[in-house]
Amino acid sequence: VTSQLFHAIPAQLNSNASRYQVSSVIEDSRVERLQEQIAILKDSMTTNIAYHANDPSAGLAQHISTEQFKLFCADTGLFVTLAFWDEGFTSNTIYQKLLSDKLRADIGYVYENIVAQILTASGRKLYYHTWPTEKGNRNYEVDFILSREGKICPIEVKSSQSKEHVSIDA
């Protein structure tokens, strides 16, 4: 079960869901029943967990939802290997195309994983925030939220030339 949760990290991030959806990885499962496996992943230091901050204000840790989280790989090279697992082995061609921005795939989730790895390596806890749009048919999301000197600092990760940041403007 722990292995299934780990191997699904790239697919879960690529799905653009507002959280890691355990039930789509392990049928009929809920986060509450898999707390031990999630703790194993966290303690193994192969994953980084970003918790949903229900109230994006100073003291983020006081306002988290332990049932709403995103999992990231602690090592982006390992993340890329998992994302392209169907290759038999992740060829150097994939890495070369990735590094030269010529990989024909939506790889925004790879950049999110890179930012998660950098923030964690710098000693930061990971938090993100979502809230419904005015119409309520989808959610806005701020990819990462930091608390610095009593102020909230949103981080929006972009993988393209797009300069729009709808979530931050909302």
Regions found by a protein language model. Give the residues of each.
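Short conserved micro-motifs at the rims of enzyme active sites and ligand-binding pockets
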Residues: 83-86, 156-157, 166-167
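Active-site ExK catalytic segment of metal-dependent nucleases
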Residues: 147-162
